[in-house]
């Protein structure tokens, strides 16, 4: 368990162009930021989930219990699609966070690819977090400018839709 007041760690993408910074502030709230080629593209942004009927929620009071880093690199051939090969190359860090007051754990897993960042919340099996309902997600994406975003429309049965900006 961490006994320091705050915690911070950095992870770089395989080509070192993206740099993720993760930290817990003085009250144990998780934050992240992202730099690309030394320029900040996602400013310090809060992570957390508010639970229904839970005064503490999964917002703060965390300590870093464990940090696990790994790298992965594979090329695979899809059965169908526009590309004949898919490169899956990333560096990963998983932070196991503990709320000592509630004896609960979550894992925040980040993957840094040469093309960008992905992350998710994981809920390991535990006695004090068996059944819960997320009331509100407080994950922030503090963009540093008026960036263009691309996405695929959801809830469609086909992969043949244009990207939207």
Kindly give the residue locations of the regions a language model identified.
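Bacterial Sec-dependent N-terminal signal peptides
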Residues: 1-10
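N-terminal accessory beta-strand-rich subdomains and adjacent acidic, glycine-rich linkers
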Residues: 10-165
């Amino acid at each position: 368990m961490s006994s320091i007041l705050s915690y911070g760690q950095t992870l770089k993408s395989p080509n070192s162009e993206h740099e993720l910074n993760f930290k817990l502030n003085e009250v144990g709230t998780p934050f992240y930021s992202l730099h690309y080629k030394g320029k900040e593209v996602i400013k310090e942004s809060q992570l957390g989930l508010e639970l229904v009927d839970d005064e503490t929620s999964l917002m703060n009071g965390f300590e870093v219990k464990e940090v696990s880093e790994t790298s992965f690199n594979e090329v695979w051939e899809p059965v169908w699609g526009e590309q004949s090969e898919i490169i899956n190359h990333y560096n990963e860090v998983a932070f196991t966070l503990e709320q000592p007051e509630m004896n609960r754990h979550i894992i925040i897993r980040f993957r840094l690819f040469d093309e960008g960042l992905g992350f998710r919340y994981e809920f390991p099996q535990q006695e004090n977090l068996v059944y819960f309902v997320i009331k509100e997600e407080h994950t922030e994406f503090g963009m540093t400018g008026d960036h263009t975003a691309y996405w695929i429309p959801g809830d469609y049965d086909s992969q043949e839709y244009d990207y939207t900006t």
